[in-house]
Regions:
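Nucleotide/phosphate-binding catalytic cleft detector across ATP-hydrolyzing
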Residues: 1-18, 22-197
């Protein structure tokens, strides 16, 4: 995640109508706290795809400056939300033998990588690999298999991809605003995290 200074998290949401920049930190109880907000009108995007670079860059800069001034933090890198008609999703699965009859982190990573190794259109790139559930020797619904005993480990995943061109143009706008895009997150996924983790 994009953290500057003492665990500062900075998020950037570039939408069709507005750009929103949020700066957050953690309080003493480790709860996320918003300390800076910047918003500006955006006219350079159409359905999640950049249609005009210069106006998008200007909007990002204004939103960034407002958030930086409110929070008192310099904004150098961000987590960026991404969405649009170019987003695609696929389901995949795979199965591997469990060495030494106990699931290791390597086993878990291997089966996920195998499930994600599928043919996707050449103009798309992987955005998220989301494990839905694991199974061991046919026992389904396992959320965390590491450390469990068994012979065969399987996984079902949900693969989310985005247009490489759309992401590159979005990245160009961010970089031209003198910011590094550390990470891209599908906007509905980011929304689900906020609902499930912070309520």
């Amino acid at each position: 995640m994009a953290k500057n200074n003492n665990e500062i998290i900075i998020a950037l949401d570039i939408g069709t109508s507005k750009v929103l920049c949020l700066v957050a930190d953690y309080d003493d109880d480790d709860n996320l706290r918003i300390i800076g907000v910047g918003q500006d009108e955006c006219t350079g995007l159409n359905k999640g795809v950049v249609s005009e670079i210069n106006s998008t860059v200007a909007s990002i800069k204004r939103a960034k400056d407002k958030a930086a001034n409110m929070s008192g933090n310099k904004i150098e890198s961000v987590i960026t939300g991404i969405a649009g008609d170019h987003i695609k999703s696929y389901n995949g699965n795979a199965e591997v033998n469990i060495l030494n009859d106990e699931v290791t982190i390597d086993d878990k990573e291997k089966v996920i990588d195998m499930a994600a190794d599928m043919d996707i259109p050449p103009d798309q790139e992987i955005l998220h690999i989301i494990p839905q559930y694991f199974s061991i020797d046919g026992q389904m619904g396992i959320r965390e298999p590491v450390g469990m005993a068994g012979k065969r480990l399987a996984v079902n995943i949900h693969l989310i991809t985005c247009s490489s061109t759309a992401k590159k143009n979005l990245n160009k706008c961010i970089e031209n605003s003198l910011i590094d895009a550390d990470e891209y997150v599908l906007q509905p996924v980011a929304s689900s995290y906020s609902c499930l983790l912070y309520t």
